Amino acid sequence: MSMFLDTAKVSVKAGRGGDGMVAFRREKYVANGGPWGGDGGRGGDVIFVVNEGLRTLMDFRYNRHFKAKAGEKGMTKGMHGRGAENLYVSVPQGTTVRDAQTGKVIADLVKNGQEFIVAHGGRGGRGNIRFATPRNPAPEISENGEPGEERELALELKILADVGLVGFPSVGKSTLLSVITAAKPKIGAYHFTTIVPNLGMVRTKSGDSFAVADLPGLIEGASQGVGLGTQFLRHIERTRVILHVIDMSASEGRDPYEDYLAINKELETYNLRLLERPQIIVANKMDMPQAAENLEQFKEKLDANYGEFDDKPQIFPISGIAHQGLDALLDATAQLLAQTDDFLLYDESDMQEEAYYGFEEEEKAFDISRADDAAWVLSGEKLEKLFVMTNMERDEAIMKFSRQLRGMGVDQALRERGAKDGDIVRIGKFEFEFVD
């Protein structure tokens, strides 16, 4: 049993941590006040949260970038900066999150309300109150905030259509799908043009969205396997609302009402629960001769088979090819979906347990390369993070960074690569001389 795959690519960036502060306590009657600069606040995380009310990834086609706020800077009197609020992004139930570059699965979000941090906010930089020691009781050193994680993500959603288009072959289902969605189904004036389900995403003018499947043409005997038979019916089994498309022009020489009865009979024969799905009758091809007269006769026959207090299906006259009557149809469909509970979505054959295993080599602390101008270029996530968090306006901070590089083995590695006293070493746009 195949399912449809909805995809989207997004970029997420967590908030940067706030910078730590260099400050000193200066109060009357307080001798040797000492350092008083507080830490910066933590940057906000980007968190995906499952919302069972969402059905598609359509919203991510209009908003692809998500950025959390940075933490506040540290303050005097040793006060911490305020941490930033996390950014919550709603995703549909069943969304798989992958790293867009590696293809690695990061998360499977399957439970309503489930949360997963896709980008961690940076920690706040430390203020100078944190660097005081007996040997250096008044340090003029602080850290910049740590950058937040930034990554490109690929989202996948295995979905089944909310709405299924049913009807005899060539009643205009594929045409209707093509004009209400961006789908491009094969369209032709012959039976069984559609041999596999086509899926499209609808967004109404009021902002509602849902998935619509143009399902293979159904003929009498399908419940016994005639034509495309049970393959078709297993798809329609999983939809919540049925749009029953009828050719009101009777261009094939059939009575529209007889078509209506025949399709419903096949649905009933295959599975009684199919008729529990609410139906909307789509009276198509109303721009054709005789269509209006046929519609009136159809309504009379329909009324004769329903009691005064029975819930009759709604009828919407449209012309798919002329784009007439579509807005009212889509709004009514969205409203009906909102009132309809889920039916069976998965059976045992569709449920597959997946486990993800992998071995990741520990990333090197730094890399050394040679630029065209003969400068030595240092790179690497760990090294670059230390650099970004170093306040290069403070001599003490620069000296601390130099000690960190030495402790990581950068000096020794440069010597082994042939670096000489006075050579230029570059990290990003920052340059300094190598001292042997």
Swiss-Prot record:
Binding site residues for Mg(2+): S174, T194
Residue stretches making up the Obg domain: 2-160
Keyword Metal-binding: yes
Every OBG-type G domain range: 161-338
Cysteines engaged in disulfide bonds, as pairs: none
One GO molecular-function entry: GTPase activity
Residues of the OCT domain: 358-436
PROSITE patterns named among the record's database cross-references: G_OBG, GTP1_OBG, OBG, OCT
Protein function: An essential GTPase which binds GTP, GDP and possibly (p)ppGpp with moderate affinity, with high nucleotide exchange rates and a fairly low GTP hydrolysis rate. Plays a role in control of the cell cycle, stress response, ribosome biogenesis and in those bacteria that undergo differentiation, in morphogenesis control.
Description of how the protein assembles with itself and partners: Monomer.
Protein's recorded name: GTPase Obg
Organism: Streptococcus mutans serotype c (strain ATCC 700610 / UA159)
Lineage: Bacteria, Bacillati, Bacillota, Bacilli, Lactobacillales
Name of the gene encoding the protein in the UniProt record: obg
